[in-house]
Amino acid sequence: DILFPAWQSKEIVRALTRAGKSVSYCHLESGTGHDSFLTDIAHLSKVVGGFLTERPVTVMKWQERLHRNVLKMVKPGARVLDIGCGDGTLLDVLRAKKGVRGDGVEIDVERYQEAVADGHDVLWEDVDEGLSLVPDGHYDVAVVSDTLQEVKNPRGLLHEALRIADEAIVTFPNFAAYRIRLTLALTGRLPVSKQLPFQWYDTPNIHCITL
């Protein structure tokens, strides 16, 4: 908001969240003075457009299959925070199948915009710096889905998830799965799959987690 500095905007978000109000927040950083965020047309138009453009949401069967284990563990009507929600796919599935009021946290502006366009409340926040906008015990469930392997401080993220929710559901790619190990052994290359579609030089995954 052009009327408030960033710290005051965050205080407003915290107050609205504590009061149980619907709130989304995004902070576009700029180093060229007051109102200079208005010059960042590429990002500003996408963020604002997310609130103005409501996309039709259809939950596909493959999306249900992808998140079936999370669906089993979330009770109907629960309050859920999806930490690292991406484009909001999991929130779409939970809303359609469990009647869940789900919110998200996302740092990527383009994926943030997509989740907001799907009608979800999303907080723009770097989870490596904590979830300062979310009060203690505010949610029934915190979901950390395919996010833990991308953050610098996984332990800190898990502590934050259990601070803001009664329980946490954590999913991640199993980097020791036999198919991955076999591909690595036979080709000598980082495996690429639907769940891990990245090359070694552009992957966001910085931890190889296994069971």
Name the predicted role of every residue range.
Residues 141-152:
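A short SAM/SAH-binding and catalytic strip from SAM-dependent methyltransferases
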Residues 26-57:
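Catalytic active-site module of serine/aspartate enzymes centered on a nucleophile-bearing elbow/loop
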Residues 130-136:
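Short conserved loop adjoining the S-adenosyl-L-methionine
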Residues 89, 93-130:
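Class I SAM-dependent methyltransferase SAM/SAH-binding core
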Residues 3-8:
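Conserved alpha/beta-hydrolase "acid-adjacent" motif
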Residues 61-77:
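Conserved alpha-helix/loop element of class I SAM-dependent methyltransferases that forms part
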Residues 78-86:
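Conserved class I S-adenosyl-L-methionine
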Residues 155-163, 167-211:
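S-adenosyl-L-methionine-dependent methyltransferase catalytic module, highlighting the catalytic core
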